[in-house]
Amino acid sequence: VIPHIAKSWQLENNSAWALAFYGRGGMNTEWDGGTATFDPDGPGPAPVMTLPGTYGSGDTSMNLSQAFLDITWAKKLDNGVSLGIAAVLAAQMFEVEGVAAFGGYTRSFAASGGTQMPTALSNNGTDWSYGAGLKFGLHAPLSERVTFGVMYQTETFMTEFDDYADLFAEQGDFDIPADFKIGLTFK
């Protein structure tokens, strides 16, 4: 179940304020058990190893959750067209376990000349990211039976997941992409 709750307040002059709180989830995955066999140093002297877990670092799991608060102002014009704008505030939480075996492919490992394993890749608990964006919308009657709607949401610029800076590109950057919707309603 993904929560969604909203409240609106009608104002004078055909305008209104609204608050909407909603969440997104779905990247809750787990890979339990299994083994991974690999050669840790390629043609080097280390032997081939079989280690527990999907990627050789124990059980693997990933979780991403997002929560949004839209603060909206809308106005209905004399011709029946409604326009709206919203500030979108966002929070994300992310956690991953069991991917430490990929440490040799990270930016921080390469920057150390291959001498230090990354500390911002796996098994660091829940990390939080916060950000904001904008949403614009239009709702217009085309006839007595048909209405048209369009919405555009800008990219939501987020703070970085510092605890997982070696996992994501751009040192933990995980912005939420822009969104565009268009539709018709038939009465």
Locate the predicted segments by residue:
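Outer-membrane beta-barrel porins/channels
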Residues: 2-187
